[in-house]
């Protein structure tokens, strides 16, 4: 098998060969002889089936295996010619040509490799920014939020239920005049305006008085988790027993112990310092995500030029196109089915954004190496576990699902990006002036 292989640029290569179908047939017969020693076919002793019987039973599978062996050899030999290793390949090689004619299979294959990315002088593109300032008012407001969070509920003297109040009430729901499972409770406590109940329920309780009974008409969302209720009209019969409010306490020693469980000697000064740092970190995260990171990304993508691995780029275009599919109208989708040129043209609209995304992936990876930023396996597992806890899922199953579906590299890249930008904008501040707001 004569092979031609050459680099089209530093990140891509094209290889070609002509495979005689006779060589595939030879490989099929070779595999059939090996298979005959292992399989059991009715009418023959184990391992004694003739090759003809094996070919009759397994010809399609043997042909596929033979072609795969030959194609693997094609890839291996192409890499030798190119002076590349298998672990340098990005994505799966793609056959751009496959023509079978007159006993010859004419094959062309595209391969992509990690590009050479030079990031010399990237520091000069880091945008200037002002360190966010935290005011006393913001600290006091955040402390009040914590105090409100742990404050006990007490019976209120209020006579009319308002937004922000806690209602203690009985309710029973009906769909088509029939009660449904899980639609009834007594002495239930709900913060009005919290959005914990289906749309319309909490608003329907506003203005109720103690011991008042009221029918509240609502509609279950179309995507409601209980399929038998999704999209259905319902009536809830409600009786209000009590209006409750939270009584905010003082920031005394006992409260500080609750709010600072890991602190040996909690104090108001330490808590305020902790809150101040938390607010500053939140402001900094917002500044990074909304302003600094997009600005930095645009600049380095524009200024650092390198060859793009075409296979990875095409995969990213496909991914972005698939993600956008649900936003297209029925008319557009119908037109795409009829007009392939329109489909191709629409897909190409995602090319520029895909180029930026792929370039950023390599730039982030290279800059992270330069700054010695890494994501450990423990950090990766912890991030997946925390996501599972947040959504009430089994963390071990969630991790296994991510591993099986190949999502872990995506999570790892997101963590690497977060760590990198936090590092960049904590060490390379070009303007130490504070933000006056």
UniProtKB/Swiss-Prot annotation:
A Pfam family for this UniProt protein? Trigger_N
Domains as described in the record:
Consists of 3 domains; the N-terminus binds the ribosome, the middle domain has PPIase activity, while the C-terminus has intrinsic chaperone activity on its own.
List the InterPro entries hit by this protein, alphabetically: PPIase_dom_sf, PPIase_FKBP_dom, Trig_fac, Trigger_fac_C, Trigger_fac_C_sf, Trigger_fac_ribosome-bd_bac, Trigger_fac_ribosome-bd_sf, Trigger_fact/SurA_dom_sf
Function, as annotated: Involved in protein export. Acts as a chaperone by maintaining the newly synthesized protein in an open conformation. Functions as a peptidyl-prolyl cis-trans isomerase.
Gene name in the database record? tig
The alphabetized UniProt keywords are:
Cell cycle, Cell division, Chaperone, Cytoplasm, Isomerase, Rotamase
Q: Which residues form the PPIase FKBP-type domain?
A: 164-249
Q: Name one GO molecular function term.
A: peptidyl-prolyl cis-trans isomerase activity
Task: Show the SUPFAM superfamilies listed in the entry.
Answer: FKBP-like, Triger factor/SurA peptide-binding domain-like, Trigger factor ribosome-binding domain
Q: Which GO terms describe its cellular component?
A: cytoplasm
> Known catalysed reaction(s)?
[protein]-peptidylproline (omega=180) = [protein]-peptidylproline (omega=0)
Enzyme class, top EC level, equals: isomerase
> Where does this protein reside within or beyond the cell?
Cytoplasm
Name of the protein described by the UniProt record:
Trigger factor
Q: Which family is it part of?
A: Belongs to the FKBP-type PPIase family. Tig subfamily.
Domain of life (superkingdom) = Bacteria
- Native species of this protein? Campylobacter hominis (strain ATCC BAA-381 / DSM 21671 / CCUG 45161 / LMG 19568 / NCTC 13146 / CH001A)
Listed under GO biological process in this entry are: cell division; protein folding; protein transport
Q: What is its EC number?
A: 5.2.1.8
